[in-house]
């Protein structure tokens, strides 16, 4: 099992990071909370989780070990796969997610793409005790930071829309959300953060 990878960020295309580890490039899918803290050329440690299927192997990476723990805990919930788990961690900060579970705040949880009421109720039931058993502690701060990141050659608006679509939002939803905030921000990371906040209201 690959527990973590230490290397240099070679390329970024939301939500995937190409990490150069001693000359070998690893494609790693990340939540936007991690993705938006990375810069091309940055030396970084990513805590990883490997999912092996019959047709593929996929690495998922996190800049914070606690986020990896939450991701693995989410995968144990019936009906929750890696894509939904990444969507939850991309949309909600760890602090807000834990608060949502502890206070049975279904209305917040169903705003995450792909999470319906039944899934939200199942998450509430299965995670409440697991969080207590794991002694998970909340962290402060927004899910998506305003760190300066180097995306590909696409415009910040296009990159922000693509990032939202990678979470499961429909193209029209992503376009409307970005259009509503693009007058106030020029960086892709800021656009993503502002759009997610507006959609969670």
From Swiss-Prot:
Protein name: Holliday junction branch migration complex subunit RuvA
Pfam hit, one: HHH_5
An annotated Gene Ontology molecular function: four-way junction helicase activity
Subcellular location: Cytoplasm
Entry similarity comment: Belongs to the RuvA family.
Region feature Flexible linker, mapped onto this chain: 143-152
DNA damage found in the keyword field: yes
Protein's organism: Acinetobacter baylyi (strain ATCC 33305 / BD413 / ADP1)
Region (Domain I) residue spans: 1-63
């Amino acid at each position: 099992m690959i527990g973590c990878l230490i290397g240099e960020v070679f390329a970024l295309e939301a939500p995937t990071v190409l990490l150069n580890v001693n000359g070998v490039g690893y494609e790693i899918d990340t939540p936007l909370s991690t993705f938006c803290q990375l810069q091309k050329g940055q030396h970084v440690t990513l805590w990883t989780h490997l999912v092996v299927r019959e047709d593929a192997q996929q690495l998922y990476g996190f800049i914070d070990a606690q986020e990896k723990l939450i991701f693995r805990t989410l995968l144990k919930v019936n009906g929750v796969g890696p894509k939904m788990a990444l969507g939850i961690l991309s949309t909600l900060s760890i602090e807000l997610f834990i608060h949502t579970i502890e206070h049975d705040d279904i209305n917040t949880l169903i705003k995450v793409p792909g999470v319906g009421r039944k899934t939200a109720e199942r998450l509430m039931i299965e995670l409440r005790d697991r969080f207590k058993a794991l002694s998970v502690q909340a962290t402060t701060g927004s899910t998506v930071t305003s760190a300066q990141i180097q995306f590909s050659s696409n415009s910040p608006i296009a990159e922000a829309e693509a990032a939202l679509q990678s979470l499961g939002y429909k193209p029209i939803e992503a376009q409307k959300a970005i259009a509503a905030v693009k007058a106030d921000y020029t960086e892709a990371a800021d656009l993503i953060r502002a759009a997610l906040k507006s959609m969670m209201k």
